[in-house]
């Protein structure tokens, strides 16, 4: 295992310690990390392939799902390889530039995902409350604009963070008590005035999470109100089932993120390893569960996946004959 000692004298290198106090369990913790990472890759690639090859799924809700899967894959690539290197080999050394890049991409992807979840909530609102105008409101052009807006919004909101970090001096330890270059974990190492970093990080996070959650909640409240007015029990059950899968994804995505966000800033009595475990949960769990939730709830995706496996088994039987 590598030693972080030389990071005290080399200002261009940081050392990601992992989970303080649980170093002896790093190897065991790598098992769920590896499992979630594998599930993320397999599940989200499956979603992308199924939607791409099934013309009936070329609809706004599934295009938004593809955006979500793409973001989840990119976020996983930004975190899981380094996390496993830390847990398996203690390879926590990371250059300052790589640390800033990881920080930017991780937080930007989280904000992009929040934007896509908001778009999916709006999609359900239009489908349920304005079904006759659905095709005219959510056109291919509008969907493309929403995708671009998600990328631009996440990138622009996070762009100042690397520059705000770059102006700081790290005159003491360069050992980051975390598994990845989380903004506040790096800021805590700096000596000097870190108020601009703290204020900007808090403002950006609350702006995105606060606005998005309010709009998502409003969309689903209006959708639920419209669903309960439906006279057909079958239509009501179908609409509630679709919205239910979306609400599950919202809860999976935002609950650990909010808990981690507020305990990291205000829960000073909470042990450090709890902060870091929660931060890893909200990065690793949603990307792995999103495909499962949508795959189970969406009949078209489920049928397509079963068909692919059945055709694969059929080819295997023919080959053996």
UniProtKB/Swiss-Prot annotation:
Glycosylation sites: 5
Top-level lineage group: Eukaryota
Pfam families linked: 7tm_4
Alphabetized GO MF terms: G protein-coupled receptor activity; olfactory receptor activity
Membrane topology designation: Multi-pass membrane protein
Topological domains, Cytoplasmic: 49-56, 123-141, 220-239, 297-315
Keyword Transmembrane: yes
Coiled-coil ranges per UniProt: none
Main location: membrane
Extracellular face of the membrane: 1-27, 78-101, 163-198, 261-275
GO cellular component labels: plasma membrane
Cysteines joined through disulfide linkages: 99-191
Cellular location(s): Cell membrane
Membrane spanning residue stretches: 28-48, 57-77, 102-122, 142-162, 199-219, 240-260, 276-296
Keywords, sorted A to Z: Cell membrane, Disulfide bond, G-protein coupled receptor, Glycoprotein, Membrane, Olfaction, Receptor, Sensory transduction, Transducer, Transmembrane, Transmembrane helix
Task performed by this protein: Odorant receptor.
PANTHER family with a match to the protein in the record: OLFACTORY RECEPTOR 52P1 (PTHR26450:SF83), OLFACTORY RECEPTOR 56B1-RELATED (PTHR26450)
Family: Belongs to the G-protein coupled receptor 1 family.
Protein name: Olfactory receptor 52P1
Organism: Homo sapiens
């Amino acid at each position: 295992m590598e030693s972080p000692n030389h990071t005290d004298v080399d200002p261009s290198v940081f050392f990601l310690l992992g989970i303080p106090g649980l170093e002896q369990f790093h190897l065991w913790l790598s098992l769920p990390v590896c499992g979630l990472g594998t599930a993320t890759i397999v599940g989200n690639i499956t979603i992308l392939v199924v939607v791409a090859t099934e013309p009936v799924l070329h609809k706004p809700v599934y295009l938004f799902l593809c955006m979500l899967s793409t973001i989840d894959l990119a976020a996983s690539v930004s975190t899981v390889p380094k996390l496993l290197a830390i847990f398996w080999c203690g390879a926590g050394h990371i250059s300052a530039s790589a640390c800033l890049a990881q920080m930017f991409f991780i937080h930007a992807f989280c904000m992009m995902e929040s934007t896509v979840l908001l778009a999916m909530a709006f999609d359900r609102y239009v489908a349920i409350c304005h079904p006759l105008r659905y095709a005219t409101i959510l056109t291919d052009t509008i969907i493309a604009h929403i995708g671009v807006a998600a990328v631009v919004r996440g990138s622009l909101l996070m762009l100042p963070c690397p520059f705000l970090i770059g102006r700081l001096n790290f005159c003491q330890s360069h050992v980051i008590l975390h598994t990845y270059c989380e903004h506040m974990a790096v800021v805590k190492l700096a000596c000097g005035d870190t108020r601009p970093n703290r204020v900007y990080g808090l403002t950006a996070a609350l702006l995105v999470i606060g606005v998005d959650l309010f709009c998502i909640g409003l969309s689903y409240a209006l959708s639920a109100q419209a669903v309960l007015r439906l006279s057909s029990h079958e239509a009501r059950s179908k609409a509630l089932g679709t919205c239910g899968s979306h609400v599950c994804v919202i809860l999976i995505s935002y609950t650990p993120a909010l808990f981690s966000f507020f305990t990291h800033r205000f829960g000073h009595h909470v042990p450090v390893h709890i902060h870091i475990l929660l931060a890893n949960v909200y990065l690793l769990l949603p990307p792995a569960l999103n495909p499962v939730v949508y795959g189970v709830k969406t009949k078209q995706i489920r049928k397509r996946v079963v068909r692919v496996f059945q055709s694969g088994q059929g080819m295997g039987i023919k080959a053996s004959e």
